[in-house]
């Protein structure tokens, strides 16, 4: 352990679940968490994800992740324990031997990623997710009619990026279910398209990969067009609000490329 890790009170909170501690290795993932780490311990190892116990979206996302976990295992690592006090809220997941996926052109990981995304699309919507309506793209839609195309009864993972797909020996997991929602089933494959274009694929190639997901095949092309337009407006808005964030400008360019490919209104 090192000085950047939480103090003794944090580890005392975890002790009933971990037993005696060994090494603690911070992970590169977890940009929205106060701590993500592999904790070597008497009862582990565990992947530990922790946030300060303050009211708001970040705390709520951890609670949502805990609530959805039983319904997404074995596509996600199982949650083994939870701990909470006035200062911290902590989740302990089964640690898996895996690495982040590679989305670049020619990556051997893409078959596994698309296969897993297809399996996620087949999951039934759990009761806990009934009230988690997907609305993030609604205000960027042309109108209420287009926004209604994003509605649906599918369980959406929505946080599609290479670091959230973990490639193991003969297994692939989707991790960081921080903000699952209920919406139109095509949205997850559409988010994959955006990420693949960002990784260097042409829009045509990216959509060919998405076409391996039944939810994409079954989607109304007009709904996908409306989403591509809204997605571009969303990233354009984000980039305008944070002009120094080069990655947001890059995502705007990516979204523009895909929208242009579809001939979608911008």
Locations of regions flagged by a protein language model:
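An alpha-helical support segment within catalytic cores of ATP-dependent transferases
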Residues: 6-17, 119-158, 166-169, 173
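Regulatory N- and C-terminal appendages and interdomain linkers associated
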Residues: 1-18, 250-266
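Helix-rich C-terminal or lid/interface subdomains of diverse kinases
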Residues: 191-266
């Amino acid at each position: 352990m090192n000085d950047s890790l939480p103090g003794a009170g944090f580890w005392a909170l975890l002790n009933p679940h971990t037993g005696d501690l060994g090494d603690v290795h911070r992970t590169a993932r977890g940009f929205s968490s106060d701590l993500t780490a592999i904790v070597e311990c008497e009862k582990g190892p565990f992947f530990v994800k922790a946030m300060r116990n303050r009211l708001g979206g970040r705390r709520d996302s951890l609670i949502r992740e805990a609530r959805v976990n039983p319904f997404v295992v074995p596509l996600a690592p199982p949650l083994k324990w939870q701990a909470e006090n006035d200062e911290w809220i902590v989740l302990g997941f089964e640690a898996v031997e895996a690495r982040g996926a590679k989305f670049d052109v020619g990556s051997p990981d893409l078959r596994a990623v698309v296969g897993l995304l297809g399996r996620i699309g087949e999951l039934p919507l759990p009761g806990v997710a009934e009230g988690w309506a997907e609305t993030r793209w609604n205000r960027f839609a042309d109108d209420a009619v287009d926004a209604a195309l994003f509605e649906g009864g599918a369980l959406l993972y929505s946080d599609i990026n290479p670091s959230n797909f973990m490639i193991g020996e003969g297994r692939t997991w989707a991790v960081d279910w921080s903000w699952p929602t209920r919406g139109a089933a095509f949205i997850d494959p559409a988010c994959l398209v955006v990420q693949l274009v960002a990784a260097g694929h042409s829009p045509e190639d990216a959509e060919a990969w998405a076409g391996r997901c039944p939810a994409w095949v079954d989607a109304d092309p007009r709904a996908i067009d409306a989403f591509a337009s809204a997605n571009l407006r969303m990233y354009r808005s984000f980039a305008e609000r944070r002009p120094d964030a080069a990655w947001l400008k890059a995502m705007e360019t990516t979204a523009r490329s895909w929208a242009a490919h579809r001939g979608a209104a911008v």
